[in-house]
Amino acid sequence: MRLTSNTFAGKLFARWGPVKGAKSYEVEICADPPVEENFHSLTPSTSGTYVIEDLASATRQWLRVRGVSKKSVGPWSQLANKVVP
């Protein structure tokens, strides 16, 4: 997964490659990744991109994504992180 930011305060842009068989993707975000309970689910995505808005500027955010098929849920991606502009 790749995270980018532009000059848009409070926004991050996530992009990932397709997962074979995935019909949608679960995306989770947190500011303290060592604690599993800190992750918050975002609205599922059906594409390989996601815009996360209304984030606190100057905070580091961590995201992960996984593919979801009709029969199963895949493993979480490696964590990606970025400081919010």
Task: Locate the predicted segments by residue.
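Pro/Thr/Ser/Gly-rich low-complexity, intrinsically disordered linker/stalk tracts
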Residues: 1-21, 57, 71-85
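Beta-strand-rich modules
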Residues: 50-75
